[in-house]
């Protein structure tokens, strides 16, 4: 196995992760920076709140497909290890994009793309959990947080079967939980914004 090529591919995937749907659309279409509006997060939920359903959906799809693409590239050349390295670096590139002064999104849509490629059925179950929570509570962040916790638990169980796939569940779940720490604090204190409300 040529680890040098894996490192190079991982770096490429980091820069693919730098492509932010919300920042690109807000700058190209609205001549604004979404990080100055709403929750100031460069993600699909904030894009939905600030610019509406179409932009929110477009943002989600861009961020989702870059994760899917990087997972595919990693798997094609390096199997499960490639998914771990390339998928993880893509998500890190989304969260900490050097092209945008290291101020990106929280990585949910991109992580979803990575994990959906790795294990479609299991991730669809996580998606159903997310949707149920959001529809019942109107809190997107709560759905994301519970999805991340579920991913970590699943990863801890699955790591015995496939170390690399189990590990990426754990790492992406922990990273996303860390990025949601302010949301968690607001949820605890009843100050988090519900979907459809600013």
Curated annotation (Swiss-Prot):
Give the intrachain disulfide bonds: none
The GO annotation for biological process reads: phospholipid biosynthetic process
Q: Which GO terms describe its molecular function?
A: acyl-phosphate glycerol-3-phosphate acyltransferase activity
Membrane topology, as annotated, equals: Multi-pass membrane protein
Which InterPro entries does this entry report, sorted A to Z? G3P_acylTferase_PlsY
Please give the catalytic activity noted in the UniProt record: an acyl phosphate + sn-glycerol 3-phosphate = a 1-acyl-sn-glycero-3-phosphate + phosphate
Superkingdom, according to UniProt? Bacteria
Which biological pathway?
Answer: Lipid metabolism; phospholipid metabolism
What's this protein's family per the entry? Belongs to the PlsY family.
Quaternary structure note? Probably interacts with PlsX.
Q: What is this protein called?
A: Glycerol-3-phosphate acyltransferase
């Amino acid at each position: 196995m040529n680890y040098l090529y894996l490192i190079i591919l991982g770096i490429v995937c980091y820069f693919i992760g730098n492509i932010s749907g919300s920042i690109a659309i807000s700058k190209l279409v609205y001549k604004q920076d979404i990080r100055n509006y709403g929750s100031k997060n460069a993600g699909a939920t904030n894009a939905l709140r600030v610019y509406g359903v179409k932009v929110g959906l477009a943002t989600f799809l861009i961020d989702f497909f870059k994760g899917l693409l990087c997972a595919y590239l990693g798997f094609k050349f390096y199997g499960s290890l490639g998914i771990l390295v390339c998928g993880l670096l893509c998500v890190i590139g989304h969260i900490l994009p050097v092209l945008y002064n290291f101020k990106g999104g929280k990585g949910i849509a991109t992580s979803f793309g990575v994990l959906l490629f790795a294990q479609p059925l299991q991730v669809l179950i996580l998606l159903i959990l997310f949707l149920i929570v959001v529809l019942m509570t109107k809190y997107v962040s709560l759905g994301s947080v519970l999805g991340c916790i579920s991913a970590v638990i699943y990863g801890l169980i699955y790591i015995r079967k496939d170390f690399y796939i189990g590990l990426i569940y754990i790492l992406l779940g922990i990273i996303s939980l860390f990025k949601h720490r302010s949301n968690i604090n607001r949820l605890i204190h009843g100050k988090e914004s519900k979907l459809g409300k600013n």
